[in-house]
Amino acid sequence: MTSVVVVGTQWGDEGKGKITDFLSADAEVIARYQGGDNAGHTIVIDGKKFKLHLIPSGIFFPQKISVIGNGVVVNPKSLVKELAYLHDEGVTTDNLRISDRAHVILPYHIQLDQLQEDAKGDNKIGTTIKGIGPAYMDKAARVGIRIADLLDKDIFAERLRINLAEKNRLFEKMYDSTPLGFDAIFEEYYAYGQEIKQYVTDTSVILNDALDAGKRVLFEGAQGVMLDIDQGTYPFVTSSNPVAGGVTIGSGVGPSKINKVVGVCKAYTSRVGDGPFPTELFDEVGERIREVGHEYGTTTGRPRRVGWFDSVVMRHSRRVSGITNLSLNSIDVLSGLDTVKICVAYDLDGKRIDYYPASLEQLKRCKPIYEELPGWQEDITGVRSLDELPENARNYVRRVGELVGVRISTFSVGPGREQTNILESVWASI
């Protein structure tokens, strides 16, 4: 039994897809356990970029099984489109498996997402308008439609009719919006179900059988710990649990079967959308990091907010997700800066604190306390070991590990597979 969980430790966009792709080389099964097509991950293979939103990064390894677990909310339209994209690129998807217990995103979820966000006015939370939240709402309310239901024509028709009637009353009475028609949705989405049914199965059985057989299983999280609905900057969060604990619920494996948790972070911080961000930069340095790091959302295309590395956030993520190893990405983006800063604590009303407050009002008053380190001017994109890094960059990497309190297993100096440097093999240490 050998398993590794990959989680984002910031607000998403940390490079989880790249690290999952890297670790997938030694895995036999790769599984997603939460989120939906609101997540975006970019994988670079032989210099070519592939952008995925729903299908696990392991799909590029035809001999390995890629799993969409029961905790994922699946938009069949997006899934069929992504499958077609991969097929057009010559990528086989015969190794994909989709949980029959995963819930389905339907057009009324997306419409409701938009209406709810518009109604918030200046209090928007920055949703991607993908219907993720409303789909999880239906799941919790026990009125959701699962993949298993989508494949059964009579059950799908019955549940869609009931749900659509309820949602249309909401659209008309509360939001003064146009109702949706049953026939078009039913025909379109039932057809999508038939297109994907070859991949549908009980993925909990596949995952547990693999673990019991001693195979290496890699669990791939979406978003990040700071977007977790319980542990993140609520309400500016996603509607699921990206923390490592989400694996057990979202994939159907027990907690005793998790061996390692790899936390992925960037050498700085970024986030898309609204919400607290203590180390956010509004100056030329911030703009430089955004441009050099190409900090624009994979899903939305929106410019990401950027800031200095926040070790307070990272220690929070380490604690609530049980992180055992750290993967530090995008060190190259900081090249050329005379000084680099790391937030080591916050000043809250004149008191130094080293924890991340739950209160949004307190977070507004938190001022980052920085430790300044000398920067480096060298181009490090060709570095292939820690010793090859300039001394100042090497010191930065070491200081990050010290402040977070987790050993760094890999560091990356660019988006390519070959730009990921191993300090300690995660698989070998299990």
Swiss-Prot record:
Binding site for substrate: 298-304
Disulfide bonds: none
Subcellular location: Cytoplasm
Assigned GO CC terms: cytoplasm
Residues at which GTP binds: 12-18, 40-42, 304, 330-332, 412-414
Metabolic or biological pathway, per its Swiss-Prot or TrEMBL entry: Purine metabolism; AMP biosynthesis via de novo pathway; AMP from IMP: step 1/2
GO biological process: 'de novo' AMP biosynthetic process; IMP metabolic process
InterPro entries: Adenylosuccin_syn_GTP-bd, Adenylosuccin_syn_Lys_AS, Adenylosuccinate_synth_dom1, Adenylosuccinate_synth_dom2, Adenylosuccinate_synth_dom3, Adenylosuccinate_synthetase, P-loop_NTPase
PROSITE patterns linked to this entry: ADENYLOSUCCIN_SYN_1, ADENYLOSUCCIN_SYN_2
CDD domains reported for this sequence: AdSS (cd03108)
Binding site for IMP: 13-16, 38-41, 128, 142, 223, 238, 302
Keyword Magnesium: yes
E.C. numbers: 6.3.4.4
Active site: 13, 41
Keywords: Cytoplasm, GTP-binding, Ligase, Magnesium, Metal-binding, Nucleotide-binding, Purine biosynthesis
Main location: cytoplasm
Cofactor remark from the record: Binds 1 Mg(2+) ion per subunit.
A GO MF term: adenylosuccinate synthase activity
Catalyzed reactions per annotation: IMP + L-aspartate + GTP = N(6)-(1,2-dicarboxyethyl)-AMP + GDP + phosphate + 2 H(+)
Cofactor(s) listed: Mg(2+)
Positions contributing to Mg(2+) binding: 13, 40
Quaternary structure annotation from Swiss-Prot or TrEMBL: Homodimer.
Known function: Plays an important role in the de novo pathway of purine nucleotide biosynthesis. Catalyzes the first committed step in the biosynthesis of AMP from IMP.
Similarity annotation: Belongs to the adenylosuccinate synthetase family.
The protein's name in its UniProt record: Adenylosuccinate synthetase
Source organism (scientific name): Streptococcus pyogenes serotype M12 (strain MGAS9429)
